[in-house]
């Protein structure tokens, strides 16, 4: 079972922002997915940390990997925590954000590739090799740009990356936010 989610940095709203990261963690764990592909994950955000009382201390990927006690109570047992990988894409004076993978299985290695198409949107492709009982799986978290031409070039970079880094015949899952609302990428 897999899931993908653009968490929009764990905050909703512009004028009166509300912290949503705690509810997101509950929802992610309730899915009971083996792999969770996340976009716009805050590795650090000093302004939000000082503004919101319950802002997570570490990176959001680490916080989301922790099992909320309410889910344990609901399931009647302690659910398994996730292994994590984080790929930083956008860096600014008060923090950074990027893509993350949460996995029920050990992550053997990770590679983060910058697929930014212009300086206004920092985008990335997080490639992880996950060690499952059935053998290794390549998992790629993608977050493509808002402009159609950018998405086309980023899709080409993704295809090139797969051809270079994923051996033929190996299991591969690619998931993410492709910003392709009109389904033009194919």
Task: For each feature predicted by the language model, list its residue ranges.
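Short, solvent-exposed loop/turn elements at beta->coil junctions and helix N-caps
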Residues: 87-92, 115-117
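Active-site catalytic loop in hydrolytic enzyme cores
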Residues: 105-137
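Surface-exposed cleft-lining segments at the edges of enzyme active sites
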Residues: 9-14, 47, 111-116, 141-149
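Active-site metal-binding loops of divalent metal-dependent hydrolases
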Residues: 6-7, 41, 142-144, 171, ...
């Amino acid at each position: 079972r897999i899931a993908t989610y653009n968490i929009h940095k764990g905050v909703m709203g512009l004028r009166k922002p509300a912290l949503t990261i705690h509810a997101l963690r509950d929802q992610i764990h309730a899915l009971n997915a083996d792999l969770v592909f996340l976009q716009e994950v805050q590795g650090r955000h000093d302004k939000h940390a000082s503004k919101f009382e319950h802002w997570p201390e570490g990176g959001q990927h680490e916080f989301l990997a922790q099992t909320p006690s309410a889910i344990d109570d609901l399931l009647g047992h302690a659910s398994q925590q996730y292994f994590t990988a984080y790929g930083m894409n956008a860096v600014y004076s008060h923090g950074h954000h990027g893509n993350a993978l949460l996995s029920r299985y050990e992550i053997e290695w990770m590679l983060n590739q910058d697929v930014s198409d212009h300086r206004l949107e920092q985008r990335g492709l997080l490639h992880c090799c996950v060690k499952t009982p059935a053998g290794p799986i390549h998992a790629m978290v993608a977050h493509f740009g808002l402009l159609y031409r950018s998405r086309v070039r980023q899709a080409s970079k993704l295809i090139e990356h797969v051809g270079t880094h994923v051996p033929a015949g190996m299991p591969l899952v690619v998931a993410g936010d492709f910003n392709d609302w009109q389904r033009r990428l194919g």
